[in-house]
Swiss-Prot record:
Protein name as annotated: Pericentriolar material 1 protein
Keywords: Cell projection, Cilium biogenesis/degradation, Coiled coil, Cytoplasm, Cytoskeleton
InterPro entries: PCM1_C, Pericentriolar_Pcm1
Family matches, as PANTHER family: PERICENTRIOLAR MATERIAL 1 PROTEIN, PERICENTRIOLAR MATERIAL 1-RELATED
Record-linked Pfam families: PCM1_C
Subcellular location, principal: cytoplasm
Residue ranges of the region described as Disordered: 1-135, 159-179, 265-303, 338-361, 376-407, 430-489, 520-559, 686-706, 773-840, 991-1018, 1063-1082, 1088-1225, 1616-1741, 1774-1838, 1865-1904
Subunit structure, interactors included: Self-associates.
Compositionally biased intervals (Low complexity): 338-348, 471-482, 1173-1182, 1800-1812
Amino acid sequence: MATGGGPFEEGMNDQDLPSWSNESLDDRLNNTDWGCQQKKANRSSEKNKKKLGGEAETRLTNDISPESSPGMGRRKTRTPHSFPHARYMTQMSVPEQAELERLKQRINFSDLDQINTNKSKDPVSGSQKKESGEPLQCKELFGAALNKDFLQNGQLSIQEDGRGEPTMDSSQARDPQQEAKEELENLKKQHDLLKRMLQQQEQLKALQGRQAALLALQHKAEQAVAVVDDSVVTETTGSVSGVSLTSELNEELIDLIQRFHNQLHDSQTQSVPDNRRQAESLSLTREISQSRNSSVSEHQSDEKAQLFNKMRMLQGKKQKMDKLLGELHTLRDQHLNNSSFFPASSSPQRSIDQRSTTSAASAPVGVVTVINGESNSLASAPYPPDSLASQNESEEDDNLNPTEKLQKLNEVRKRLNELRELVHYYEQTSDMMTDAVNENTKEEEETEDSGSDSEHGDPQPVTNIRNPQGISSWSEINSNSNVQCGTNNRDGRHLNTDCEINNRSAANIRTLKMSSTLDCHNREDDKHADLPHGEDDEVEEDRASEDSMSSHRSSLGDVAGDAEFEQKINRLMAAKQKLRQLQNLAAMVQDDDPEPQVLTANASNMGDFLGEMEETKQQPNNVRVSTNKLQKDAGLNEKAREKFYEAKLQQQQRELKQLQEERRKLMEIQEKIEVLQKACPDLQSAGLGNSPANRQTSPATSTPAMNECNTAGKPLLEFGESVPVGNELWSEMRRHEILREELRRRRKQLEALMAEHQRRRELAETISTVAASVKSEGSEAQRTPQQSRTENRTMATWGGSTQCALDEEDGDEDGYLSDGLDQAEEEEDAPSMNDSFSAYPNNQIPESVYYLKGNKDRWKNCRPLSADGNYRPMSKTRQQQNISMRRQENFRWISELSYVEEKEQWQEQINQLKKQLEFSVSICQTLMQDQQTLSCFLQTLLAGPYNVVPNNVASSQVHLIMHQLNQCYTQLSWQQNNVQRLKQMLNDLMHQQEQQCQEKPSRKERGSSAPPPPSPVFCPFSFPPQPVNLFNIPGFTNISSFAPGINYNPVFPCGFGDFAHSGFPQSSEQQQHPLDHNASGKTEYMAFPKPFESSSSTGAENQRSHRQPEDEVEKRSTWLNDSQEVKKDDQSQQKAGFPVSVQSIASGHKNQSDTSRRRNFDEESLESFSSMPDPVDPTTVTKTFKSRKASAQASLASKDKTPKSKNKRKNSSQLKGRIKNTGYDSASASSVCEPCKSTKSKHSEEVVHAKVFSKKNREQLEKIIKYSRSTEMSSETGSDLSMFEALRDTIYSEVATLISQNESRPHFLIELFHELQLLNTDYLRQRALYALQDIVTRHLSENNEKGRCIKSLNTATWIASNSELTPSESLASTDDETFDKNFPTEACQDCEQNDADNGSTMSTSSHFEPFATDDLGNTVIHLDQALARMREYERMKIEAESTLDSEGCSSNLQGATAAKLEGPSTSECLSVPQSSEVSAVPCPRIDTQQLDRQIKAIMKEVIPFLKEHMDEVCSSQLLTSVRRMVLTLTQQNDESKEFVKFFHKQLGSILQDSLAKFAGRKLKDCGEDLLVEISEVLFNELAFFKLMQDLDNNSISVKQRCKRKIETTEEIQSYAKEDKDETETVKPVQGLETYDGNEVPESIKSDASDQEEDEESESGPVAISLSKAETQALTNYGSGEDENEDEEIEFEEGPVDVQTSLQASSETATENEQISSQELSKTKGSDILSSEQQSVNVKGEQDAATILPHYLNVVENTPPLPVNTPESFIAASMKTEESSSSLPGNETQMLDTACVVNKSSAGSSESSMAGSPDTESPVLVNEYEAGSGNVSQKSDEDDFVKVEDLPLKLAVYSEADLLKKIASEAQTNSLSDELLGGGGEQDRELVGDAQTLKEPETFGAQSA
């Protein structure tokens, strides 16, 4: 409204209009309307709502209709209507708003008024209700308000209508004089009319008293009906009239409530109230707009002339009409007094019924009657008779006889009824199908246009609800309005959708208020049901309208007396009709039958409702049609207009009061419904869910009717009305909607089928399991595809429960019925999978689904569970089913609804992505690795490692990305692992059925609240299980459940049966046991996402620790750990094939005993995996990768390091299961390996400790062993989650500090982060923290500088970083960054302080995967500052050497941490100790002084050159000359030409990059910086390559490996994205190896750490084993070539189950680990692996060394850094040393694993370690292998250079140089032996640790 537009925004318009029509009309009309509403008395109020609120009203309209449709320009195109339309345009700006108003009036007068009354309507309605506290008062006051407002209208219309135009003339459209005259006349007449209205209001007050009783009866009846319908919504919804009016009312009330809430959110609720207000203001505005026709005519200057002429003619007629109106007023007063109670009460009751029936329609009827009459009379008055007369003349003259008009009106009524049915249908469908609503809106608006057009014709006889003129004018206006509708419906489609929503609500309200909207629709239904009654009413009303039309026409005709007489007759007819309505209401009240009452009320109301719906439609069309009508009304005599006005004012008042009463009733009903919904959401879902189920049943039979009835009762209405007349339209519209729904269903079905198909592949495997335990695993595994689909099915069946489950799964997937329909059809498609689900939408979804859904419901919101268990959003489902109810829920779920739509869009996109990704499995494999990186980045970057994506839905894009990636990966894993999964699942199914039946209850108890039904859609989301889990959305939790599978999919995409097993089991079992894994584990790890292992490892761990009780509580963590540890234990015990889901599924594969064992070991191994005592070796705390990231990292670490040897130790089946687990839980693979390793892990822990602390200290090793063991136990509890969460800020601050402090040493940070990534488990992290603490404490005592990091070395920081690393395990890089940042800040600073080794160690060993490829060069470049530090470390070299243990410990912490993370922490820690010894001896022995001397020698040559060019600008030529000079000098200074080649290239590229920043600057300005840059680069590179030379010198096998590395480096060149490694990979690798072999002993001895740090050649101990990103950066990420080679070689060479691909990276890492572990544990297997890996490693490992960034190759070459070297070197030496390996089996296995891993990582082409730390985890594989290989094969592994040990940039060496370097490295092997703990000491330690590190491998980084 003008003033009330604002209040009307929400729902207030509705309340405001009814009460506004009473007192608020005066207030509003006086206060609000007349500013804008002068144009039309009632309409000006409406239109002021429209004008002032034309935009505001459009806003209001938009506000109201946002759900169905914007409703913005409901009838904007209706502007064609001349005067009223022009004004309506100005006010409504479109006839769309007229229809909005009409629909709103229909809906709002009753529905929205109550809704608005219930809601914020009261503010406006307060003023409105001031006069009319009750409906009768509303009527009287409406009449009084209308009279007052019309009197004030006249005044205000004079005053405000002028808006500066004192006269209603507002000679805007017409001659100012004529308009002024006309408006003055109109004002006078309006004054008269208002006076009469005041009199009538007095009369109406009496009538209102009567009507109050009647309305009270109506209220009671409707409330009873509403209550009955609330309880039994679908009892009457079975048929078109079957949907009880109350149910429809409730639905529409809920729809309206939801709309209003939504529109309150959208601030577009006004449109619905505006419908009424517009109706009121239409009547008022029509009066005023008649008076304002001048203003309208201003807009319609063309029509001004015509209308002005007509106005002149009509002025005469108007005078007649004034007389007639006076007579009519008297007669009307008499009639109102006489029949006013009955006609006024009866017909008002009937109007009320009509209003309540049409709630807006009847209000419009009353209002429209008044509006039509008033605005007609006002149109004749404001529009001097010309407007009404023109309308009336055009109607009368142009129109047919009144009989024909009555026929037309009746036809139009039928059309309107049909269209109303359609409208209701589409109101329903607009909720279900906004598109359908739009189309329906078009049709309905056309119908409503016709209705409003007829209303334009009709309302003119004030008494005639359907004005006789309305017939012709109806036809005309129908043509006009239909044309306008055609246009306006298109524009107004939004509004019409709003109107339809309102109509929907109105239909429901009408069903309630009319006793049934169905009777509007059921008017035909009632004509059928209450045919005599309804038809009598309708016939009578039609007759009455005919009479009133004819009499109205006669009154509109020139015969004023006849018009009056006919008006009296019409009034009497209306009174009879209203009496019948009242009788019907009484019958309704008496019958309490929603149906009979509906039929009765509808019967009586049908005619009125039709008339009122017509007029309601006419009323917006009065806004529209009032253009035509006002034009025609302008032609009407003002007297007739006044009479019409008064009559219609009275009618409007009565009807408004009735509508208000009905509105109140409806509001009460809505409130009751809402209360019932709130109180009995189950009943709602049962009533509406069961009704939806019934509806679903009948909707299945008559889905349109039932679903639509569910939606808005519209289908029923549509059936009722549209069956007779709207059959064509309705059938078409419904057919369109059904087609749309089917398309959406097909779409969703396809999506669901895609998901289900994939899932059925899994389920096919699990379905054997699922077959027996469909409700258990199938329901969960399938429930992921099927709960979304089952819920979709339930939605298809319209079982709100299922739909609600989908809503929870999808967040709001069924937020809209369209979604529901789509989902419903998906569900219907899904029934094959979950037929019971769809068959039993609520109750008979399998218990598993029920529990899952129920648990998901509980988990999500503890929403009431329907029998379906999907019930949680049951009200929401009802919302969808029952739009009103659904919208009621939408209050709460609107965000969810939009989110559901988004998720559906996501799901559609994801399904498309799934389809695409199914065809791009290799890409997805790469994406799997990228996904791990992305999960690291996203999780860490977005909301923190755990909460980043999960906690914030704000990261929905991240969810989408991860979701899509996960879906891709899941689909790939499903497809790839389908057969293997099926095989193993068949085994597991038998046991899984049992376990899942066992697990399902507890897991469902725990996690069913977060079942993974959306997994099919969100399965990709499951990739960041925590992120998804952090969404707290069951679907996301389910996503999380897939995260392990996804992880495994990436890791084990191709050949891992267990990966398919793990991928599927987690998807299926986690789906099946989302409680355990997803819901619980993820819930527990919500803030602590375990992208790879979160759901598995945590759950399994906790499951193991806490079998069932803690499973429920901690199964969130336990389930995650369980998955991971189940993998470990599965591999170690062949039981922990999976986490809980892996366990169930993998157990299914494996054995029932395996299942039980696996479940036990899911718990145990997950516990051990979460650093719980390994089931195999309880003393051993296997890595706990609580976070998926930790799992992934641990899996990578395990794969790369420990898991290999452990897996080798484990059986092949265990390996398979573990690979499955690894695939399932990338960390799980390592974890699974770790349990087996745990026996060795004890030793390995000690070994890792020895390693880590052999650098830093063996004391710290012991401490770490202690800490690791204690931490193993502590970390198994999921402490990393809480610790990380508690310490996240601290961790991040420390990491930020670490990063900021090491900005100049990106490589240090990268490798540090990589190494930290290796710290996959809390155990490893805590051990690393303790080691760091010890190191820091030692260094603090030894070196104050070393103590700089103690702050970050705090155990809390460690724990935080551990916790952090848990997410960083999910975000392998990020959290490891965080941890490494914390840890490096500690360890690195210690190491840095100790010597550059820390920086280089950290940077080298901790390869931050994300930076791995890019940062290799960048890191070297940024190691400039690291050079400075390394020089500082050179100065601290003695200090560093003295603290070599600490330094080695820091690098060893990193290396060992990486080793711990890497799994064979023994191997890696051995390599780290070696490298720490190498760092301590060779790495620190990188003579920084020698480097300084060398650099000085170079700079001595460079400085003079620069001095010569000091005045020159640093041009590219000059810089190139400097670079070439430096390179030449470097070559001169370099001992190895081979190294110089590589180093020259790498250094040249680095120098080029470093010097590039000086380009354009004057040399004298940047000369110093240039020299510093050059010196730093030289120092970094020389130190690094000397380290690499030392490493190369450490073993001759490194020469072979150097060849391999060179080959691999060639491959890496193509793949590695290291700045120069790619281009210089081959040569540099050789040179690097040679150089490393030669120089690393020196440089390592001098300051390997410094050089490593500075040169990114982290000290050998800091195994430079690059993460897959670094070593196989492009290969692993971009291609599976590395993986393929490695896999091929591994698979070729040995029983390596490594399905190394990008996905297999983890899987391959695990398999390599497993295979290596198995084979190594089987010394033959390890021999084979060694042979494999020798061949592969000689190929792939040397290739890997080559492919690995050159520093990786060098590291591999450098025995002191045996991690990488062990790959290639271990491949050779492992084969040779396998038997001789001091790490019998374990270390050899680890070395083999390392070889496999390094092979994959180093042999990037093969990416066998794609999942290996080299590629994915920074140092996991290489350090890992180096450690394992070194520990077990100390001498040989000394020859092995960790990839991390490899300088990030290798000096280019020719093969000859590399061979020389390798020879020197062979010599250095003894150095590395010495370095590794006195040479033999650490061998022994490492050998001892090899087994302990098997545990630490199990513990992954726990050893570290």
